Amino acid sequence: MGKQCYVTGRKASTGNRRSHALNSTKRRWNANLQKVRILVDGKPKKVWVSARALKSGKVTRV
């Protein structure tokens, strides 16, 4: 499984990079994911969590 937020499901999104001549090539916007230890079913587990989920208090560190 690739890098994806364990809580919110956020992951990298894709789009186009545009030059001044309006040529397009593919690019990615990566989500701000942090590897943190959280409690899952009463046991600590290391998972990828988005910074937005950490700041909003949807998950607490161990």
Swiss-Prot record:
Stretches for region Disordered = 1-23
What is the name listed in the Swiss-Prot or TrEMBL entry for this protein?
Large ribosomal subunit protein bL28
Keyword Ribosomal protein attached: yes
User: What family is reported?
Assistant: Belongs to the bacterial ribosomal protein bL28 family.
Gene designation: rpmB
Q: Which GO terms describe its cellular component?
A: ribonucleoprotein complex; ribosome
Q: Which GO terms describe its biological process?
A: translation
Which InterPro entries does this UniProt record tie to the protein?
A: Bacterial_rp_bL28, Ribosomal_bL28, Ribosomal_bL28/bL31-like_sf, Ribosomal_bL28_bact-type, Ribosomal_bL28_sf
Q: Which UniProt keywords apply?
A: Ribonucleoprotein, Ribosomal protein
Annotated GO molecular function terms are: structural constituent of ribosome
Q: Which Pfam families match?
A: Ribosomal_L28 (PF00830)
- Mind giving the lineage of the organism this protein is from? Bacteria, Bacillati, Bacillota, Bacilli, Bacillales
